[in-house]
């Protein structure tokens, strides 16, 4: 199984994803690590990425997800996956793996604009900052088929809830 933890910046995807992977003894990958240097620089400057900017990034994340599934490995991967079209691409199985999409579980972390803005204001050393928050909320297409988790609780409580809702406890 692969758990895709999604949401806008500042929802705690990396913190929650790492903690979840540690608790389950699963592999972990952060989509931020798949961004090109050019994409990171754009975001650092507060410039929202275009779909063309995101295309190779999404392809690399998709490849990682399906590599784990093909190998029979369990993993947690974080990705903003703001648009339904991005999620459709990530969940689309490569040739020969049709029927395997049920091995991917989508977890949507969400919070109020105010809560996320406060978190971003406190966050240090990340290339994406508060300047992108409004554009991320505007771009977000809330997922239809995801486990929806409010991020006003602690990361530990959020992980407990995810594990409970996925019957992993």
Name each region found by the language model.
Residues 13:
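Conserved lysine of the Walker
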Residues 98-119:
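Conserved phosphate-donor/acceptor-positioning beta-strand/loop module used by diverse small-molecule
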Residues 5:
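Hydrophobic anchor at the beta1->P-loop junction of P-loop NTPases
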Residues 2:
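Walker A (P-loop) ATP-phosphate-binding motif of ABC ATPase nucleotide-binding domains
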Residues 122-161, 169:
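Small-molecule kinase domains that catalyze NTP-dependent phosphoryl transfer to phosphate-bearing small molecules
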Residues 52-100:
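Glycine-rich phosphate-binding loop used to anchor ATP phosphates in small-molecule kinases
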Residues 9:
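The conserved Walker
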Residues 18-61:
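Conserved substrate/cofactor phosphate-moiety recognition/catalytic segment
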